[in-house]
Amino acid sequence: MAGPTRGRPGPRSRRPPASSRRSGRARRRNQRSDLSARLIVAVPAIAVALALVISGGLVFTLGMIVLGAVCMHELFAMYERAHPVRLAGLLGLVGLLLAAQYGTQFHVLLAAVAVVPVLFGLTVVQRHPSAAGIAVTLMALYWIGFGLAHAVLLRRLPHGEGIVIDVLVGTFVGDTGAYLGGRMFGTRPLAPRLSPNKTVEGLGIGMLAAVLGVWFAGRYQDWLPGTHALVLGLGVALAAPVGDLFESFIKREAGTKDTGRLFGAHGGALDRLDAVLFTAVVGYYIWAAYA
């Protein structure tokens, strides 16, 4: 068989079009800049989180109250048309977290029940009372309030300082692993209606990263056996994507891309804490069973 005509490259020597090469380089540059922006946001946030966790006690609880108030403000702003009962939400948040600081999980449950008649009473005197407003306020209390209350409960357990850090490490390492894994290897959409950019491959890599992150952190804590660290890591790995997808659903229903602008292009407090609100709960019950 005759070879390719002189002057014309054969099939193996063909190069992709210049436009394709340029778009590939631009995509890689965007990925690097996006990762850099994530790190710029993450470093000061991690420093503040570590300071609160190490301080513990009432300082940690007050920090969670402030963080919860910011998260509630973002949620209520997204659902402003429902007329949420802001005062009831804030009072309930403070009650839940103080119950966690000075009581047990039973007292947290009592506070969650006690806030319901307060919510109904404040709804009646609102200018625009609505069932939708009650629903949004209750969602804020039982999503944001319960999640942060369990973070306080977790901090109060034996070795709570280290376990809270382990849960945060697993959550954020898993999130970063899912992001990078999805960018590099993702082909199959995970939940296209909720979050088009999430992939099955990213989910798997993120879960593996979360388990390994907690296990690796546990190797420097002689009071945390390897099997306990693996179980805790698995719980974090399973809970984190559920929290992420739940928040994506909330944003989709509200018709918004980000919950706020606290972290600039990387969204609001809820965008950064969506997974933590679930992993703190799971982490508490796993460690409470061991402790």
Report residues per predicted region:
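Acidic/Ser-Thr/Pro-Gly-rich, low-complexity N-terminal segments
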Residues: 1-29
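Membrane-embedded alpha-helical bundles of polytopic integral membrane proteins
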Residues: 25-234, 238
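Interfacial loop-to-transmembrane junctions
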Residues: 88, 253-276
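Membrane-embedded alpha-helical segments of transport systems
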Residues: 177, 204, 270-280
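Hydrophobic transmembrane alpha-helices of multi-pass small-molecule transporters
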Residues: 210-211, 275, 279-280, 288
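Juxtamembrane boundary at the C-terminal end of a transmembrane helix
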Residues: 285-291
